[in-house]
Structures are given as C-alpha cells and as structure tokens.
Amino acid sequence: MLNGKKVIVVMPAYNAARTLLQTYREVMEHGFVDLVIVVDDASGDDTVAVAQGLDRVRVHRHAQNLGYGGNQKTCYRLALEEGADIVVMIHPDYQYTPKLLGAMVSMISSDLYDCVLASRILGGQALLGGMPWWKYVSNRFLTFAENVLLGAKLSEYHTGYRAYSRRLLEQLPLAQNSNDFLFDNQVLAQIHWLGFTIAEITCPTKYFPEASSINFRRSVKYGFGCLGTGLQFRLAKLGWLTSPLFPRKP
C-alpha cells in the first residue's frame, strides 16, 4: 500500500517466460506493491509456470488467445475484484523499467492525477534507446493528429506503461474497446472524453530481441485505427455521431 491505497500491478503476458522474472523482481523491490496479476494470453512457452512460482502473484490463463486488448480487459477486471485502488499496467517483456513505479503511483495516491503515462518520447531519447526510426516517425505523426482531434497535448498515445486510479477504471467503458492493440489508444481517448486528468513522466526506451513488438503491416492497421478513434471522438464531441466508445452522460 501507499498512502493507504492498495496497489496492484497487472502484466498482460504473451510468451514472456524469459523476461517475466526480471520484470517481477524489479516491481517487487517497491515495498508498496500488494499484488501482481499475470494474465497469460495462451502463450506457447513457460510463462504460466514461471509466474506460478512467484510470491504475491495471481495467475490467470486464457484458454485461447484474446488479443492484447482482450488481455487487458481481464487484467483490470481482476484487479478491481482484488480491491485495487491504484492499478499499474506494465509489460512483462522488460521493455519498460519498473523503477518508475514509485513516481507513477505516488502521483495517483496523492490524488493529483487519475492516469499517469510513462512516455518514451519525453526526454528525446527514444531513437537512442533503439526505437526503429519508422516507429518513431509514425508515433510522432499519430500523436500530432490525435492531439488535434482530441484537443490534448500528450507527448504520445502508444506507451504500454500506465497507472490508473480505481475511480477512473470503474467509469471507462472498456468492454466497448478493441481486443487488439488499439485498446490502449481508445482508453486515452475515453479518459479525455470523461474529463479525467493525465500526467506524463519520461521513460527510457529499451528495444531488444525479447521485447514484444508488432510488425509493419499491423502497425499500419493500428495507425488507421488510431486516426479513426480520434475522428470518432471529434464527431461525438460535435454531436454529429453516437459512439459506444464515447457514451453521453444521462
């Protein structure tokens, strides 16, 4: 716990057996983490076996692959069932450093923010950390377009390292979101729609063979999906579109 609030870390896992333990160890170095939830999305390796051997870890396995977004839906449902006040999502592939947990959680436990993002773009070190140039360029373009459509000023919308307050998660219509990688992007658009506050901190970038990634073809599909989400947001704001992603208050 931190400031009297229960902290749960969720890890959407897929073939993460080689990096899960290292990620877990650094997460648990923070004495305030009450529980880690690992949701395995029908991995073909020993991810479940590794997770089951760890202390203060709840393991849930999908019988079939539900996708990155589908995995997160399970993560957040289980975290809320366990009584989490603050939920941190970090990939178990060790691409993001768990050393930022303290800063991220404290910003929510102090009631300053409801969402904290670990941005790979802030600080200008993304390319030096190994981010492929085409991913960097597409990240910057999509972020610019989405900031215009959403009326926001985020440095990026595509990080997989996030912290949320319970009250935020309980209001997000997550069931309406994609089961694929677009899920994360839709969540941020929904947060803006509901008027919750978002903070960002800089996060070192680490790209290596074990780190998860999506190929160019799926990245293109994801990019068009992000633009579509932003357009839906803008049209819904103007009252020209009704979307289950952005429900109107009764």
Q: PLM ranges: what are they?
A:
Residues 16-19, 43, 97:
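Donor nucleotide-sugar binding loop of glycosyltransferases
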Residues 40-48:
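A conserved acidic beta->alpha catalytic loop
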Residues 27, 41-42, 66, 75:
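Conserved short acidic donor-positioning loop in nucleotide-sugar-dependent glycosyltransferases
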Residues 8-12, 37, 61:
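Short hydrophobic beta-strand elements that form part
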Residues 15-29:
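Short, well-formed alpha-helical segments that are part of the catalytic scaffolds
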Residues 58, 62-64, 68-81, 98-181, ...:
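Acceptor/aglycone-binding surface of glycosyltransferases and processive sugar-polymer synthases
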